[in-house]
Amino acid sequence: MPDPLPDLSSLRLAYTRAELRRADLDPDPLRQFQGWLGEALQAGLREPYALSLATADASGRPSVRTVLLRGADERGLTFYTNYESHKGHDLAQNPQAELLFFWADLERQVRAYGPVERVSEEESTAYFHARPRESQIAAHASDPQSAPIANRGALEAKLAALQAQYPEGTPVPRPDFWGGYRVRVREWEFWQGRPSRLHDRFRYTWEGEGWRIERLMP
């Protein structure tokens, strides 16, 4: 039996690492995000480009999972996945999403919300072939993603068959069901933990010609 959990209501940390002032913010939220992500990478955080991706289906039922950020530029934030996955079905029905980056060691988090679109076939193919060969084959093996499977052995047998189909030196084609999505961010929030839970929060909202920046109550 596992050890009993401690009283979770008594567990807390004091956030004292830094503050975030309006004067500290870049007028462009993308540059602000790139700066914070760069600091997280320099600090040696484990996979600071990992994010929680929240989607909802047509009925409004939400779901969330962790994916990896694979691009951040003026077009938006990009990730790759199986289009037939749960998230892929959600985004086909309801093409909007919210992303959350949480960097505990820096006492920071970033939220980003916006409509979602698929990246071009060419962009998906270029990224697919930049991945390790084992990951390319695994993309084929894990289809249909999120579907029930009898056991681990069935998955490994499928992988072995694909490895035989695509021996070393043979190009692995990008499957039609796999590719990228880009979130065209229309709202950002930057959060810096502060003492006594009086955190610093700033929201950027796109207003058609520029970004409006507001401090939010903690």
Swiss-Prot record:
Catalytic activity annotation: pyridoxamine 5'-phosphate + O2 + H2O = pyridoxal 5'-phosphate + H2O2 + NH4(+); pyridoxine 5'-phosphate + O2 = pyridoxal 5'-phosphate + H2O2
GO MF annotation terms: FMN binding; pyridoxamine phosphate oxidase activity
Free-text remark on how the cofactor is bound: Binds 1 FMN per subunit.
Pfam families to which the protein is assigned, alphabetical: PNP_phzG_C, PNPOx_N
Binding-site residues for substrate, renumbered to this chain: 12-15, 70, 127, 131, 135, 197-199
Pathway the protein acts in: Cofactor metabolism; pyridoxal 5'-phosphate salvage; pyridoxal 5'-phosphate from pyridoxamine 5'-phosphate: step 1/1; Cofactor metabolism; pyridoxal 5'-phosphate salvage; pyridoxal 5'-phosphate from pyridoxine 5'-phosphate: step 1/1
GO biological process: pyridoxine biosynthetic process
EC number, as in UniProt: 1.4.3.5
Cofactor entry: FMN
Binding site for FMN: 65-70, 80-81, 87, 109, 145-146, 191, 201
Keywords of the record: Flavoprotein, FMN, Oxidoreductase, Pyridoxine biosynthesis
Record function comment: Catalyzes the oxidation of either pyridoxine 5'-phosphate (PNP) or pyridoxamine 5'-phosphate (PMP) into pyridoxal 5'-phosphate (PLP).
Assembly mode: Homodimer.
Family the entry assigns: Belongs to the pyridoxamine 5'-phosphate oxidase family.
Official protein name in the record: Pyridoxine/pyridoxamine 5'-phosphate oxidase
Organism: Deinococcus geothermalis (strain DSM 11300 / CIP 105573 / AG-3a)
UniProt lineage: Bacteria, Thermotogati, Deinococcota, Deinococci, Deinococcales
